[in-house]
A protein has these predicted regions:
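Flexible, glycine-rich active-site loops centered on histidine and acidic residues
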Residues: 1, 61-124, 164
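Active-site mouth loops of central-metabolism enzymes
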Residues: 1-3, 58-66, 138-148, 256-265
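N-terminal beta1-alpha1-beta2 module of alpha/beta enzyme domains
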Residues: 1-51
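Short, acidic/polar
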Residues: 1-12, 149-155, 267-274
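Conserved, mostly hydrophobic/aromatic
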Residues: 13, 17, 25, 44, ...
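Hydrophobic faces of well-ordered beta-strands that scaffold small-molecule active sites
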Residues: 21-23, 53-55, 83-87, 144-147, ...
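An alpha-helical appendage that flanks or caps ligand/catalytic pockets
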Residues: 105-133, 174-279, 308-315
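A conserved active-site cap/scaffold subdomain adjacent to cofactor or substrate pockets
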Residues: 152-173, 179
Length: 316
């Protein structure tokens, strides 16, 4: 069961002292069951004790800012000090489904920053005199993170003085430029006086490089399906991935996944250190497209052990 496995994964992450566990908003995707993101955050938070739980992220233009403020205000009231609100502007789905969600593509670039300001206003204690209030939500200390994969999101996060989570796990092209823009133009805020970067990357670890490579075929098949616009559930790993993709698909997938850490403990350690030496991020966020649940749990354990050996910053 997908939800039960997700809770098991979150409990395992908590046991391993991962900092946070985030869930993404996606719609009309057979391989992802987190369309009701706020509901699942409550489910995971209720089944764990201390790990932070949040959205990675809420696709804000799909929603009313007030509704999101109320939902996350409720979550924060139920699980104080444990809720994160990551927000993005992408639809999290295909164009037809985006229309079904009531999304208006004409004014998103202007409306998204305004929606973030609305959230901040609804969460502010000073909003108590307003005609429209988020109850619960008002006065809640809920950190807002801006998600993105472009320089636009980097500029916005810097201007608003908010932490920045970059989607390097599927759109790495602008990562270096986005980080430079964010750091160079950061405007300190009361809640976040310093810039804070989370690098979202793919991670598949196993006892050996060979085993990890075999597990990674599920990840590759998932991205092949994206290229082919073939929305299927995740597939078990195959013996020969070259029999599945053609040369053009292979090149495209490997380009999208070039910040993927796949291997045994020694290989993972080397790759993580090279990445950190270059980007110097504040936090790693690991996503693992692994078909077998036990192998997935083991992968996160290996990453935790490697990060501890390296004395790196937070891992989520």
């Amino acid at each position: 069961d997908t939800f039960t496995d997700s809770l098991s994964l979150a409990r395992n992450a908590e046991k391993l002292n991962y900092k946070r566990f985030w869930l993404a908003e996606h719609h009309n995707m057979a391989s992802i069951a987190s369309s009701a993101t706020s509901v699942l955050i409550g489910y995971i938070a209720n089944g764990t004790d201390k790990i932070r739980v949040g959205s990675g992220g809420i696709m804000l233009p799909n929603h009313s800012s007030l509704v999101i403020a109320e939902q996350f205000g409720t979550l924060e009231s139920l699980f104080p000090g444990r809720i994160d609100l990551g927000v993005g502007r992408a639809p999290g789905t295909d164009g037809i489904t985006a229309k079904a969600l009531g999304r208006n593509p004409m004014n998103i670039n202007q409306h998204f920053p305004h929606q973030i300001q609305e959230l901040q206003q609804y969460f502010s204690p000073e909003n108590s005199k307003s005609a429209v209030r988020a109850i619960p939500g008002e006065g809640c200390d809920i950190p807002i993170y801006i998600l993105g994969s472009s320089t636009d999101s980097a500029w916005l996060a810097a201007k608003m003085g908010l932490p920045y989570a970059f989607a390097g796990h599927f759109a790495p092209d602008m990562m270096a430029t986005a980080f430079e823009i964010y750091r160079s133009n950061y405007e300190p805020s009361a809640q976040f006086p310093e810039p804070y970067i989370i690098a979202c990357v793919n991670g598949i670890a196993a006892e050996t490089d060979e085993k990890a490579k075999q597990l990674s075929n599920t990840l590759y098949q998932a991205f092949i399906n994206i290229i082919r616009d073939d929305r299927q559930p995740f597939s078990p790993p195959v013996d020969d991935i070259d029999a599945v993709w053609n040369p053009m698909e292979k090149a495209h997938v490997l380009k999208m996944l070039r910040y993927s850490f796949i291997g045994g403990p020694s290989t993972i350690k080397t790759k993580l250190q090279e990445f950190q030496d270059y980007f110097n991020v504040d936090e790693f966020m690991i996503t693992a497209h692994i078909f077998d649940q036990e192998a997935k749990l083991k992968s996160y354990e290996i990453f935790r052990n490697v990060v501890d050996e390296m004395n790196l910053n937070a891992i989520t």
